[in-house]
Amino acid sequence: MVTAGIARNTRAGSEQAARDETGWLERYRAVRAFTHALCAPLVTEDYVVRTMTDVSPTKWHIAHTSWFFETFILTPRVPGYQPLDARYAYLFNSYYVQAGERHCRAQRGFVTRPTVADIYEYRAHVDRAMTPLLARLDETDGDADVRALVELGLNHEQQHQELILTDIKHALWSMPLRPELGASPRAVKNAEPLQWVEFEG
């Protein structure tokens, strides 16, 4: 079973994480919030653009990371969990063959529906379902397999945070107006020119 294999491969790392001072719920919220912070400078149109085959739309990244928690933790391990939209299992799978059929990677940029607002509601739906599960992990030792899957899910989302940045960097660079991501201040002075330094001996 795919979830069992994933859990076995990441159990050692999650055991260490469980000993850290930061609780599971706090870590989950921090990682998810950082994804939102990365996307904060974007406008709606930025979320859906795809400028080359190796780029995925930002909207797809933020949906896919929620799909992971839903597919490998909530659906099989939380009795009574109901997906917000069962069709998302097909749309936002990537290359997890054992998890079912998936939308063609090359056509991710064709998907304007669900909307960006729909995707944020999807993330909120998954977050609401994950909250009591993570709170229980903080209160008890919990299930080692679940801890391993949560750890993997957080690492997976952090990987996609990097992909969000690299993909949107190419997308913004491809635009004639050269928009910038965020309003970070520019350097107040130029760097000093490089030069050789001589030492005796």
Segments from the language model and where they lie:
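Amphipathic, non-membrane alpha-helical segments in soluble helical-bundle scaffolds
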Residues: 21-28, 55-62, 85, 89, ...
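Phosphate-binding active sites in nucleotide-utilizing proteins
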Residues: 200-201
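Alpha-helical packing segments of well-folded alpha/beta enzyme cores
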Residues: 24-27, 31-38, 65-68, 115, ...
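Short, contiguous alpha-helical
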Residues: 3, 45-101, 136-190, 195-197
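N-terminal regions that are enriched for targeting/export leaders
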Residues: 2-47
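Acidic/histidine-rich alpha-helical segments that form the ligand environment
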Residues: 27, 94-140, 148-152
